């Protein structure tokens, strides 16, 4: 433990020795001088009064009381074998000390190690001594020296250290080398002398304090004077340079001068004062450094300078050996009680402090420190006094500069910086205010400019609006005048239309008053009432089965008086389809005969606009159920019909729509001509003249629009049937289509279907007349159907042959049904079988073949007036199914019908298309003879009418003959070789009928072509066939409601019934021609 402490002390000592090398270099002379002066002389010091005075300080013990020294003589030093050797304990400054040496060195070799140690350090307690009030810790400065026989060569070392419990010893491990001890340090007896001087320092922190004893201080001044002077001069030069830079900076100096002079006297006086305690604390803190040996001398110098400064202030006269008054500079700082005050103006003091130099350095130094008797003593005393006065002056100047610098840097300069900052802030505020004012002015200018601009814009806008208002009023005036003019023209036009309508209505009423024998003529149909109810199922719900289709014939037996009293009210009710394979028709087996009332093939109610009627299929609201339609006819409706009403065919086999078109003689297109009933007052008539001007454009538009429709709607004018051949309708069994045409709102439709898969209903000349409904038919309710465009051709339009375009296909699926033997007459009377195969519609785009009508597969129907005197075709011909029936239909101008329906057709192209779809090769006849025969028949029927009742029929028949002949000539040849295919239903009798002709194969079309023979159909019909019990007024029935005399020419279709060799009704009749006799025997 002791070794470790000694080792540490040795390290401390060695370090302290190295730091005090200058003192060690003083040599033995200095050591001897110091020792001899103290020991031998013993006279009081001659230092200045402020240098040695410390009695005015009442802060504990004086430095002289805290000083002690001890000399230790070690005999026979060379014989010591111990590692360490201690001296006796001595007391200094209230502490007990001892000297510790290591003869062989402490942790070093060949060196002498010396340490000063505090005795009983482990027993020391805080506060045991007066000087240790703060505890066990003491600051002390001590000197250890090894005396030589020549005192000038003595070796010594000085150090400053704070002793405390863990650092209770301090010294030098390498104090000196062992070989040097033999150079006069060990005397002849082998004794080594070691001396220790200890100064316990009474430290303070609030002000400079006296540290050293006067004798000990003088000894240290001779060694460390230059160090003390350097410390003080460095500080003063630093402050002077700072002040000099301030003065050299003209701007700052001028600014500071302005600031300082701008301050009032009280402010300047207050700023030039500072408390003493504040200044002195700063002095002690700045200059006292514990590790510096010279710090004690610097503190003694400052203490002496502070005393000199205070003495100058008090004008103390008690001065011994001081510098003369002339040599003393003017003071900068004075002491006023507890305040340091600047004695003059700050500007002057700063210039003076910056320019006034410090006392010059002493370049001589001490050169001889040896003892030369009394002379030497006097010289040393003068040197000591001179050094002390210099240190006192350095201390005073240092304190003054420190006070001036502190007051300037902490008060005046800070105030100056604050003033500058405030001024700058004021300038910035002023600049901002100016900028704000300028911006406000600019904003005001911009606002005024914008307001002016807006005002101008507003004025311009108001001006534009004013001009617009004027222009608008002018335009309103002009438009009002134009509108008034248009209204006036419309009123005039309406008046003209009303007049024409009234004239037409009056003419129609006058024609309606003529007696009509239609009821007698159409005796072929069963006894039915003027109105009929029909159940019409949905198109999708039809059953494809053909087992019980013969039971679909609906017979309605109204009172017989109804048919006799109103012969013109003709009705027919036919099946319109099968729902889920079940018949929804009502059968009455009580009667199989025909009444005077004809079978109504369809009743169509609809609106009439212009020259056309619009028909459209409409599904019934509930699937699988029939829609019951009631239709009533009135005799007066015949008189109210116009020239423009078209006829249409309506069939719906297999739940799908079958569409066909009314056509002229010579074209193979089977169409059921419908009689349209319409309330008399609900029609809007268009004059014939206007119709004739627009019909060509309408026809073209309709022809172009037909391919876009899902179904084909065809109507032909009743008046112009002889002149206007209708387009072709062909069927295809593979394709299905639902005919949808624009229907007429608030109109109920009753349609019938043909009884065979290839049979299509065709209206005759008599049945092509359109019958109007009674007035009370307006009350009937029917589903509203959207309108479709229908066109009727005017009476006087020329017949122009048209090029046949590519066919437009409309397919409909057809079902066939087999008629029961029981219902032969019923099936024959009630209408065609609904089983029709698909047909392909071909529409020539020419005025001649203009299409007028609507879809035939929906609820459209026609009134077919059949002569009551003729019988029906017996059922010996078997009904073919869909797969067995030929797919091509023969559509001739002869309205052959096995069931008593009327058929018509033309268009050889339809035959060709039908032949490609047919698996059979039916017989062919020429088209020319059919056309010619129709003309003859129409003429003979017209001649057989009563002349007094119809005086204008001769003229009409002549016109028809001429026009028909022109048509045949225009077509290119009287012998038109284009084949006309009979309906497959006539395959059973065409052999007998045409047996006189010779057949040949027509390889191109795959059909049998029959040349015109004397016994063929074309040859055996030179004139009209006279039917038994035929009403001669039937061909003239249509003429009753015509506006002009040419209207009867349109009704050239004649009723030819089914021909069969086994049929007993097929007998010789009038004029040698075959006569049809009805099955009832009449």
Curated annotation (Swiss-Prot):
Gene3D superfamilies: Apoptosis, Tumor Necrosis Factor Receptor Associated Protein 2, Chain A. The lineage of its organism: Eukaryota, Viridiplantae, Streptophyta, Embryophyta, Tracheophyta. The gene is TRAF1B. Disruption phenotype: No visible phenotype under normal growth conditions, but the double mutant plants traf1a and traf1b, or muse13 and muse14 are extremely dwarf when grown at room temperature. It comes from the Eukaryota. It comes from Arabidopsis thaliana (Mouse-ear cress). Residues 446-507 form a coiled coil. This is TNF receptor-associated factor homolog 1b. The modification N-acetylalanine is found at residue 2. InterPro entries: MATH/TRAF_dom, TRAF-like, TRAF1A/B. The keyword Membrane applies.
